[in-house]
């Protein structure tokens, strides 16, 4: 059984304040920290061989906190791929107690452009709720100077296919800690959702989604798998 575990980061400080966040690098709130720890509890008995996060701190914090009580007792270590010598471990004994963690901006949240840092209710009052709904929930319409969900998938999916999927094919169990829209674009592909179907896909913060790669397809497991 080869597993793919997806987790939207815990609540961030700007989620709490109802602000558009996007690529602004905001940490988890106190609630988000607790959500990440609770998510870790629900997956602590699932095998994990590699971890992938975005380059944003809320994604990294979530992954690290979720792994603090993993039954393997293995420690995540960040692989600096631009300088592999920085994270090279010269002890085989220690290597066996570690899980590599890779970061990529391809997994970053959708970039919200000129909306970043603005209050969602205030933006709705300024531009109208229908316009904001189009920016937030349509598939191809982007906010000013930002990305649509389609645009997000244009970077997320190639990275998954080139970097992550080959590891699944090798039988590696993968844990991805990322963001609402980068994960929505990925789930759209995994579950073969239409452009209309993905619009109703909601991913709560801090709640893992588990798939099994059968060698032929991805099968979604019930939340109780962990």
Curated annotation (Swiss-Prot):
Matching PROSITE patterns: PG_MUTASE
Catalytic residues in the record: 9, 109
Enzyme Commission number, as recorded: 5.4.2.11
GO biological process: gluconeogenesis; glycolytic process
InterPro entries: His_Pase_superF_clade-1, His_PPase_superfam, PG/BPGM_mutase_AS, Phosphogly_mut1
Function, as annotated: Catalyzes the interconversion of 2-phosphoglycerate and 3-phosphoglycerate.
Name of the protein: 2,3-bisphosphoglycerate-dependent phosphoglycerate mutase
């Amino acid at each position: 059984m080869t597993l793919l575990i997806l987790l939207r980061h815990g609540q961030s400080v700007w989620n709490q304040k109802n602000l558009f966040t996007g690529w602004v690098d905001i940490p988890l709130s106190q609630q988000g920290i607790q959500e990440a720890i609770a998510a870790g509890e629900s997956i602590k008995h699932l095998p994990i061989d590699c971890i992938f996060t975005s380059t944003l701190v809320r994604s990294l914090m979530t992954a690290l906190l979720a792994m603090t009580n993993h039954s393997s007792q293995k420690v995540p270590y960040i692989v600096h791929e631009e300088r592999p010598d920085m994270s090279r471990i010269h002890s085989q004994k220690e290597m066996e107690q570690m899980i590599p963690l890779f970061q990529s901006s391809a997994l970053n949240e959708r970039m919200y452009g000129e909306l970043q840092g603005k209050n969602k209710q205030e933006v709705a009052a300024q531009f109208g709720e229908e316009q904001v709904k189009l920016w937030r929930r349509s598939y191809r319409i982007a906010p000013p100077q930002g990305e649509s969900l389609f645009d997000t998938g244009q970077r997320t999916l190639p990275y998954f296919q080139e970097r992550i999927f080959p590891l699944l094919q090798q039988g590696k169990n993968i844990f991805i800690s990322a963001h609402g829209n980068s994960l929505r674009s990925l789930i759209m592909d995994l579950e073969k959702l239409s452009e209309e179907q993905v619009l109703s896909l909601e991913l709560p913060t801090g709640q893992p989604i588990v798939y099994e790669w059968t060698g032929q397809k991805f099968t979604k497991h019930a939340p109780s798998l962990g």
